[in-house]
């Protein structure tokens, strides 16, 4: 859907020098809000056109907002992208997990519309939000670089869709060599303001935020394969900004130290960890998912236990990127937001207890 006109309530960047014009899809989500904020604060950026299905009251400097949906048959993306220096594509739908054809329509077909519109409008740079989830199952005892296969975990919709888009971009880059394509592959992204949204996406009503307290979590399960990487969303946004302003191309892994495992989680909750096979945990999750008590599917659980650990050396070197916060600090901030029901003034990030 498109609004009849763009909301230009934010003041343009002052000064006579012409800076970059950027379009951000999915501008109101966890990553989108951090990326838009980072762009709005950078002197190299003159204006940011923010696309979202629902226009928020949140208005950073230099931003113009447009209600737009990337799905087939919806917004005229070529018109919206015309005259732009770069498109950062972040729009993504996590639910409904019981109807993967619906998420496929938005995430895959919608992304393909974005890619095609970038080429048709003559936009020189496309920055796409890929993910660690695009990677094929990999090692947990060493890190892999961006050359690791990106076939995803085929049973989970999220990883299947992220991997499929990697293949789409492989073909796209051959067909459109004039477009500089950058693929960002972050680990799990957390910030205080995303806590309510992420609880709704992954845990639903089964996990009220007020229950995530140390006194109520005496132990953390130590599952085989439970080793993952995380980073603060604002640190990921800094990498997106660098990808726009630096003449780089290709894929970039993004992760902060340390690797998160059961011992790290146990320390966060001041609890003990205990070894348990994955099968009973998966069975309980599958039952809760079938009963629609939790939105996250057991297939996504399987995928998480198979994700490789990533080497972020390329991002640190070519993007001059160095995360400000550790993965533990990002998780601490997220958990604090979860307990307090923190959010932001956008529809996806709306606060909720």
Regions found by a protein language model. Give the residues of each.
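C-terminal amphipathic/interface module of NAD(P)-dependent oxidoreductases
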Residues: 2-11, 15-16, 71, 272-275, ...
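Conserved Rossmann-fold NAD(P)-dependent oxidoreductase catalytic core, especially the SDR/UDP-sugar
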Residues: 109, 113-158
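NAD(P)H-binding glycine-rich loop region in Rossmannoid oxidoreductase-like domains
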Residues: 57, 63, 68-109, 117
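NAD(P)-dependent short-chain dehydrogenase/reductase
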Residues: 172-228
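Catalytic helix-loop patch of NAD(P)-dependent Rossmann-fold dehydrogenases
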Residues: 141-185
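N-terminal Rossmann NAD(P)H-binding glycine-rich loop of SDR-like oxidoreductase domains
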Residues: 20-41
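Glycine-rich NAD(P)-binding loop of the Rossmann-fold in SDR/ketoreductase-type enzymes
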Residues: 102-113, 160-161, 231
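Mid/C-terminal beta-alpha module of Rossmann-like enzyme folds, strongest
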Residues: 227, 235-296, 332-333, 341-353
């Amino acid at each position: 859907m498109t609004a009849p006109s763009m909301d230009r309530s934010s003041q343009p960047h002052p000064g006579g020098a012409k800076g970059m014009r950027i379009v951000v899809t999915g501008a109101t989500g966890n990553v989108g809000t951090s990326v838009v904020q980072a762009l709005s604060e950078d002197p190299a950026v003159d204006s940011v056109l923010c696309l979202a299905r629902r226009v928020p009251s949140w208005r950073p400097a230099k931003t113009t907002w447009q209600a737009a949906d990337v799905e087939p048959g919806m917004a005229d993306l070529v018109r919206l992208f015309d005259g732009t220096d770069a498109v950062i594509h972040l729009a993504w739908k996590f639910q409904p997990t019981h109807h993967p054809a619906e998420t496929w329509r938005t995430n895959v077909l919608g992304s393909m519309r974005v890619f095609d519109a970038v080429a048709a409008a003559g936009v020189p740079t496309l920055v796409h939000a890929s993910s660690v989830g695009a990677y094929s199952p990999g090692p947990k005892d060493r890190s892999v670089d961006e050359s690791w296969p990106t076939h995803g975990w085929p049973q989970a919709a999220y990883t299947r869709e992220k991997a499929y888009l990697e293949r789409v971009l492989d073909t796209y880059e051959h067909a459109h060599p004039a477009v500089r394509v950058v693929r960002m592959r972050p680990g799990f992204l957390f910030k205080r303001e995303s806590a309510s949204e992420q609880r709704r996406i992954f845990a639903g009503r089964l996990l009220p935020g007020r229950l995530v307290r140390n006194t109520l979590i005496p132990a953390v399960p130590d599952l085989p394969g439970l080793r993952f990487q995380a980073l603060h969303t604002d640190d990921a946004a800094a990498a997106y900004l660098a990808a726009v302003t630096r003449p780089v191309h290709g894929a970039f892994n993004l992760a902060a130290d340390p690797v998160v495992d059961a011992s790290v989680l146990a320390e966060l909750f001041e609890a003990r960890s205990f070894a348990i096979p994955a099968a009973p945990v998966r069975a309980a999750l599958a039952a809760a998912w079938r009963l629609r008590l939790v939105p996250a599917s057991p297939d996504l659980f399987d995928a998480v236990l198979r994700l490789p650990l990533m080497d972020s050396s390329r991002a640190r070197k070519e993007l001059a990127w160095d995360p400000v916060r550790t993965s533990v600090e990002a998780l601490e901030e997220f958990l604090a937001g979860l307990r307090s029901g923190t959010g932001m003034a956008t529809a996806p990030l709306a606060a909720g207890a």
